[in-house]
């Protein structure tokens, strides 16, 4: 058995068995890996898809447990096991009392609509393709002030609301939103109840990025986009209090923190 791997932040870890991991071994973190000539790779006994070049990807949710096991089968048929220990994160909690009930829970009249929309978004995030864009750096999609962070949560009248799973970038309506990495549009809708103008890009092997509260979409479903392409404009659509981009990162249905991977440079400057 190999030595346990720990990581507080961005890491490149390798061993004598040619295991290489890059990313963040922490709650909300995405990790890419590489093992030469591996026949199979598993995380906690669940198979991971492997690219022809031996790369794979996985991630850890907001409240994921801290101990995990990565295992792989070498070309000779033998299995290797690598324990992983991820770091626990503290999140911003905001408790607000005296809020009117209608703002705590949505009216019953919109439940059918919101369930249908949630199903469509879930299906888009379940997209699996063999693109390998996820191996490329993730650049900043828009200019503006960081107004909200991943993992934060509000309590209204003692009732916990869903945690925030994105990075909010506040700026005026019409501010360009650029593709932070190449991908394919798998979802584009101008008017979802909660998220308003919503766009989802597929980057391969279960990795997607989502763009919410958009004023205008400049791409459509099925369209290929390149790093730095203008894909949308910041807006205040859906249930929001002001114009901003809510930017999200997913590995399948696992919600991750895009801020951990975001390069400081604006995506449009990389074209």
What does each model-identified segment do?
Residues 197-202, 207, 223-270:
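Conserved, short, structured surface segments that act as functional micro-motifs
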Residues 19-29, 34-89:
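Ser/Thr-rich low-complexity repeats and stalk/linker segments
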Residues 180-218, 243, 248:
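Zn2+-dependent peptidoglycan hydrolase active-site motif and core
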Residues 1-11:
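Sec-dependent signal peptide recognition
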Residues 26-28, 36, 65-67, 79, ...:
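Extracytoplasmic
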Residues 83-195:
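Surface-exposed, glycine-biased beta-strand/turn segments
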Residues 176-187, 219-234:
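Short, well-structured beta-strand-loop connectors
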Residues 10-18:
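Hydrophobic h-region of N-terminal signal peptides that target proteins for export
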């Amino acid at each position: 058995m190999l030595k346990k791997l720990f990581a507080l932040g961005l890491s490149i870890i390798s061993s004598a068995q040619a295991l290489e991991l890059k990313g963040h071994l922490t709650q909300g973190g995405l990790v890419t890996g590489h093992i030469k000539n591996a026949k199979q790779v598993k995380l906690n006994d669940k198979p991971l898809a492997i690219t022809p070049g031996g790369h794979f990807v996985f991630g850890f949710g907001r409240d994921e447990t801290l101990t995990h096991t990565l295992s792989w089968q070498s070309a000779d048929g033998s299995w290797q096991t690598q324990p992983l220990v991820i770091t626990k994160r503290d999140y911003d909690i905001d408790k607000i009392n005296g809020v009117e009930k209608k703002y705590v829970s949505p009216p019953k009249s919109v439940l059918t609509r919101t369930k249908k929309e949630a199903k469509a978004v879930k299906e888009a995030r379940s997209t699996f393709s063999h693109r390998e864009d996820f191996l490329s750096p993730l650049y900043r999609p828009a200019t503006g002030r960081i107004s909200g962070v991943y993992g934060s949560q509000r309590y209204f009248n003692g009732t916990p609301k869903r945690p925030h799973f994105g990075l909010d970038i506040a700026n005026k309506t019409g501010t360009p939103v650029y593709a932070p990495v190449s991908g394919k549009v798998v979802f584009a809708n101008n008017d979802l109840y909660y998220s308003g103008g919503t766009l989802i890009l597929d980057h391969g092997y279960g990795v997607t990025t989502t763009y919410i509260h958009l004023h205008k979409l400049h791409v459509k479903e099925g369209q290929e986009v390149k790093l730095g392409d203008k894909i949308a404009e910041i807006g205040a659509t859906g249930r929001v209090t002001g114009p901003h981009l809510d930017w999200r990162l997913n590995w399948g249905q696992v919600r991750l923190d895009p801020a951990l991977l975001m390069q400081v440079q604006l995506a449009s400057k990389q074209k």
